């Protein structure tokens, strides 16, 4: 069933950890979970142009720490930090606690599955030929060091009367191998012919040690991203 399941969920606790990192009792859990959903929704809405790939939420004692992984940190921060202050106030209104927002710059957006999927979806909305968009993304990822990539596009591609699925793959994408570091992203293109779905799998190598934080450590060491600014 490795072909069917979300490869991120399959590897949680093995070489990847959760994007919500906190513990709560039975009475508080539902409330905090809904807060996380609202925080992510409002940040994605406000930061549409900032190429946000991932939002990590941590809750130390009476605080809320939000880490935004973005390919355009300048858009998130805004002029003299004005935009990030607005975001902090909006998140604080939801959580009613002290909020800290950190920004991590993604140095190689071509190797982030979510950003690749969103880029292809945006090109489909601009009526770029879907084969050209897919091939360009595959070539860019392999050139920058990916060991394998697969891209699926489905829907009324090119305005066809009958919906279908097209896919490209280059290199290895071992979905059954649990130690494989596989990034997965999805996006939806809203075209005049209807919606088109985009799925991207990127294989970046194998993580041999059993460490749920291994992928985050790789990113922190500069493999794919680097810290940009801590906003208190």
Swiss-Prot record:
Database matches in SUPFAM superfamilies: Prokaryotic type KH domain (KH-domain type II), Ribosomal protein S3 C-terminal domain
Protein name: Small ribosomal subunit protein uS3
GO CC annotation terms, alphabetical: cytosolic small ribosomal subunit
Organism for this UniProt entry: Rhodopseudomonas palustris (strain BisA53)
Molecular function via GO: mRNA binding; rRNA binding; structural constituent of ribosome
Keywords: Ribonucleoprotein, Ribosomal protein, RNA-binding, rRNA-binding
Gene3D superfamilies noted in UniProt: 3.30.300.20, Ribosomal protein S3, C-terminal domain
Pfam family, one: KH_2
Tagged with keyword Flavoprotein: no
Coiled coil region boundaries: none
Listed InterPro entries: KH_dom, KH_dom-like_a/b, KH_dom_type_2, KH_sf_prok-type, Ribosomal_S3_C_sf, Ribosomal_uS3_bac-typ, Ribosomal_uS3_C, Ribosomal_uS3_CS
Quaternary structure, from the entry: Part of the 30S ribosomal subunit. Forms a tight complex with proteins S10 and S14.
Designated gene of the protein: rpsC
SMART domains: KH
Domain KH type-2: 39-107
CDD domains (alphabetical): KH-II_30S_S3
UniProt family annotation: Belongs to the universal ribosomal protein uS3 family.
GO BP terms: translation
Function: Binds the lower part of the 30S subunit head. Binds mRNA in the 70S ribosome, positioning it for translation.
Signal peptide span: none
């Amino acid at each position: 069933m490795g072909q069917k399941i979300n490869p991120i969920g399959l590897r949680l606790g093995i070489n990847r950890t959760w994007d919500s990192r906190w513990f709560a009792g039975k009475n508080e859990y539902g409330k905090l979970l809904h807060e996380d959903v609202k925080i992510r929704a409002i940040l994605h809405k406000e930061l549409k142009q900032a190429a946000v790939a991932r939002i990590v939420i941590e809750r130390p004692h009476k605080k809320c720490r939000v880490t935004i992984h973005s390919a355009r940190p300048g858009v998130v921060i805004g002029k003299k930090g004005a935009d990030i202050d607005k975001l902090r106030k909006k998140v604080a209104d939801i959580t009613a606690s002290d909020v800290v927002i950190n920004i991590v710059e993604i140095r190689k957006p071509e190797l982030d599955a979510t950003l690749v999927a969103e880029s292809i979806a945006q090109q489909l909305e601009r009526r770029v030929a879907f084969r050209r968009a897919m091939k360009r993304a595959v070539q860019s990822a392999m050139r920058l060091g990916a060991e394998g990539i697969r891209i699926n596009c489905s829907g009324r591609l090119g305005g066809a009367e009958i919906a279908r699925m097209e896919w490209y793959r280059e290199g290895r994408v071992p979905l059954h191998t649990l130690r494989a570091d596989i990034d997965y992203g999805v996006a939806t293109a809203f075209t005049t012919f209807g919606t088109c779905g985009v799925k991207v799998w990127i294989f970046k190598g194998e993580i041999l040690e059993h460490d749920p934080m291994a992928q985050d450590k790789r990113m922190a060491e500069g493999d794919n991203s680097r810290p940009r600014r801590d906003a208190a």
